[in-house]
């Protein structure tokens, strides 16, 4: 099984999101623990790892998100733990793999890499999201493209409809 993980899951697991309570943080910690038994999908140009690096520590501490980042970084070339896919830059959509769908036209450009790697993976891995409300309004459009967003902290999605 493969999984795509939005950076906010690491941030919440580190306890660095003010609106995330203990239940949300626990869900993120559990999800990262489960991800260690799956294959984490990343891209060969390191768009995802570069973003993780901005929020995670190579020391692997003090938080669970930091520990996960260090673990993933050390295993990025190990096909037992990582599925590395190629995503193609696109001038308008960000990535060619990102759907040309009007319902997704306003989706956050910085999150498009997660959709692109999920589609490039070929097995429709779930995308884990903790706190980013941009995913909520497009969940049905993504579903139409065979993708599922797993909302680890649904309580943070209140009022996210546009």
Q: Where do the PLM segments sit?
A:
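Short, flexible/disordered intra-domain loops and linkers
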Residues: 14-22, 56-59, 100-105
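Sequence/structural signature of beta-propeller domains
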Residues: 27, 31, 104, 138-141
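Acidic, PIN/NYN-like endoribonuclease modules and their adjacent C-terminal/linker elements
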Residues: 44, 119-162
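Active-site neighborhoods of divalent-metal-dependent phosphate/nucleic-acid chemistry enzymes
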Residues: 81-127
């Amino acid at each position: 099984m493969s999984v795509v993980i939005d950076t906010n899951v690491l941030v919440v697991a580190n306890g660095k999101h003010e609106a995330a309570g203990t239940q949300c943080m626990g869900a993120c910690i559990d999800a990262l623990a489960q991800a260690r038994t799956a294959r984490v999908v990343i891209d060969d140009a390191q768009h995802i790892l570069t973003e993780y690096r901005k929020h995670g520590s190579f020391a692997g501490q003090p938080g669970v998100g930091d520990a996960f980042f260090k673990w993933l970084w050390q295993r990025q070339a190990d096909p037992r733990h990582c599925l590395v896919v190629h995503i193609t830059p696109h001038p308008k959509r960000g990535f060619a793999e990102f759907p040309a769908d009007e319902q997704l036209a306003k989706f956050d450009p910085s999150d498009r890499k997660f959709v692109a790697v999920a589609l490039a993976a070929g097995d429709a891995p779930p995308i884990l999201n903790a706190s980013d409300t941009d995913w909520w309004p497009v969940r049905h459009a993504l579903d139409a493209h065979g993708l599922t967003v797993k909302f680890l902290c649904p309580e943070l999605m209140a009022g996210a409809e546009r």
